[in-house]
Structure formats: C-alpha cells, structure tokens
Regions:
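PLP-dependent amino-acid enzyme catalytic core
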Residues: 1-346
Length: 346
C-alpha cells in the first residue's frame, strides 16, 4: 500500500527501511515487482533465513545495530546521504492501512468472531487491524500480545515500567517503543494488551507445526501463546488468532522442537547410580526394551567424586511416549534397586 502511494520521482530515488520482520520482506518483494531499488537495514540478531529472503528478492541488505531503533539511526544517515525514501515499518498511516487489509480478509471469512489476539511489535499490524475490526463490528474485542521480554505497548498502555531483555525468540517484534501514530489508534480501539512467556511462544510454534503442519515464527505465534496462557483456552467462544510470519532458522527450529519434547518428557535424561560390576547396564537396557523405550545416548562414568570408588554413574537419555510413560520407567528402574534422578536443564 505504501509503495503504491509513491510518486514516480520517489520511486526513482529508491526506498529504504529498517526491519527484523515481515516489513522488510514486504518492501523487498513489492519493490521487485514495481522495479524500485530497495535497501533494507536489519539488526545483528536477525535470522539468516530472513536476511537471505530479502537478498533473494533483490534488496540490498545492510546489517547494523543491536535492535530496530539502532538500525533506524543508520537508515536516517543513509537517507541524508543518498536521499532515499524512508518507509517506516509501523509509524506510517499508509503502512497501517495496508496491514489492516489482513483483518478485512480475516473477518470476511470469519464474521462472527468475538475476540482476536494480535501480535504487537511497533504497533502497525494491531492498529491497522483494530481500525478495520471496530468499523465492521464495534463489539469485537481486540487484544494485543507482546513477549514479556519486550513490553513496549504494555508499559504505554498501563503506564508501567517493566524492564526489557536483550533477546527473544520473537525477534520480529523486538521493538523498544511503540509508534506515536500507532499508540494513538491503539489507545482508542484496542481493549487489552497482555504479555506472554518465551516458553509459551515456543509451545505455540510447536503446536502450529505439529498440529496444523504450519511453520510460524516467534512473532507470529504470540497470539496462540496468549491463548494458551488465557482462560479463553477452555471457552467455546469464536476467538481469532493472527499468525503472521514463517521465517525461522532451521537450527533454532530443531532446538525448539527438542526443548518441547523435553518439556513433555518425551525425551529425558536420567542419572543412575549403580555398583561398578558387569551386567548393570544390561538390566536397564532390557527394561527399556520391554517398555518400548528407545535409548538415545549413554554416558558411563567411574570418576564421579561423590560416589564410592566401587560405584559408577550412568547418564542415559531416553525417548518415551509421554510423561506417564517416563514416570513409569523411572519407577521401574528404582524397583531394580538403583538410585535414579531426572536431570533437568533450567
């Protein structure tokens, strides 16, 4: 929407934007179709997948700053030097209205929604969606969702002073300050804003992938994360969740899925103390085989100083069906006379 509003003179100058999320790719792809030169400045912690896609779309990508605000300072310098047209990721009415078209399509398909959870970074998406939603249905509830690591809107909305962290799995919404234009709209139209834990975001990403076969990045999974933490989870009301963005590094995704298996005890590591004599490991492996439990890794140590010189410690990683299955194998190993502890990474 913003690109289409540019004059021919502005198009010839080329555009520049700072973003760690979907805004960058929207600009890059739009410029590719319209024949406009695009420069994108992204923070240092931007996933390689997002960087690569912008390059593939033909944009000139510059990595600068530890967050979007620092990236914006570099953008301003480049605008002054090269006279680029700056396209702000959220504090721009044309961008806000463009993002609001998402809600128009959403409510055309689901007109009876009573409540919608919307991810919040700088406030572009939620302000645009709120304008459309409230015009179509003034009774619909709009709830903004942020990670507790970046409570920008929450602090402005409720006049609190919650602290910020340096990183989040939802890097696409890692914004330290809500746009002025966005905040004005949000305070008028948004009903509530909530914060969610990083672990809930991880769980939401896993649920999207495993249940819906849909890859959603951290920022896009905020809505479902909020629903998981809310009492609304058990209600039968028509509730909507905006899932936006599917750019997640393969390494991060694999780590996230493994962490979710650990939370569910489908993968667990046990520390087992035993006498240092033949046949001990065999007893445990036979028990695992009988219970259809897969052994993923084994570490056998005779040099643990808190044990007797005639004892050994076995650290064994197992794959189970669920928590009930995991607890069963722990109890069965204890019945064999072994001292068992579950190793939990905090």
């Amino acid at each position: 929407n913003k690109l289409l509003s540019l004059t021919e003179i502005q198009k010839k100058k080329g555009v520049i934007a700072m973003s760690a999320g979907n805004h960058a790719q929207g600009i890059s792809l739009g410029c590719k179709y319209l024949g406009i030169k695009a420069t994108i400045v992204m923070p240092n912690n931007t996933p390689f997948e997002k960087i690569r896609k912008n390059i593939d779309y033909g944009a000139n990508v510059i990595i600068h700053g530890n967050n979007v605000l620092e990236s914006e300072k570099h953008v301003n310098k480049l605008v002054e030097k090269y006279d680029f047209v700056k396209i702000h990721p959220f504090n721009d009415y044309d961008v806000i209205y463009g993002q609001g078209t998402l809600m128009l399509e959403f409510l055309q398909k689901h007109p009876n929604l009573k409540k919608i959870y919307i991810p919040v970074g700088g406030g572009g998406l939620i302000s645009g969606c709120a304008i459309v939603a409230k015009n179509l249905n003034k009774n619909i509830k709009i709830i903004g969702v942020e990670t507790e690591n970046f409570p920008s809107l929450y602090n402005s909305f409720y006049k609190t002073k919650k602290s910020f962290e340096k990183s989040t799995i939802a890097e696409g919404v890692a914004v330290n300050k809500i746009g002025k234009k966005n905040l004005k709209i949000i305070k008028e139209l948004v009903d509530e804003t909530v914060l969610v834990k990083e672990s809930s975001i991880e769980q939401a990403i896993s649920m999207f992938l495993l249940n819906d076969k849909t890859l959603v990045e951290g920022a896009g999974a905020l809505g479902l994360a909020a629903l998981l933490e809310s009492k609304d989870r058990n209600k039968r009301d028509d509730i909507g969740v905006i899932a936006c963005g599917g750019n997640l590094d393969s390494r991060v995704l694999s780590s996230l899925l493994m962490r979710e298996l650990v939370r569910k005890k489908q993968v667990l590591t046990l520390s087992i103390d035993m006498e240092d004599k033949p046949g001990q490991l065999s007893e445990i492996s036979k028990l695992c085989s009988m219970e259809k439990i897969n052994i993923l890794a084994v570490e056998h140590s005779r040099f643990t100083l808190d044990l007797s010189v005639r004892a050994a410690r076995l650290n064994i990683t197992l794959e189970t069906q669920d928590k009930k299955h995991a607890n069963k194998i722990i109890n069965l190993i204890k019945k064999l006379g072994f001292k068992v502890r579950e190793k939990i990474e905090n």
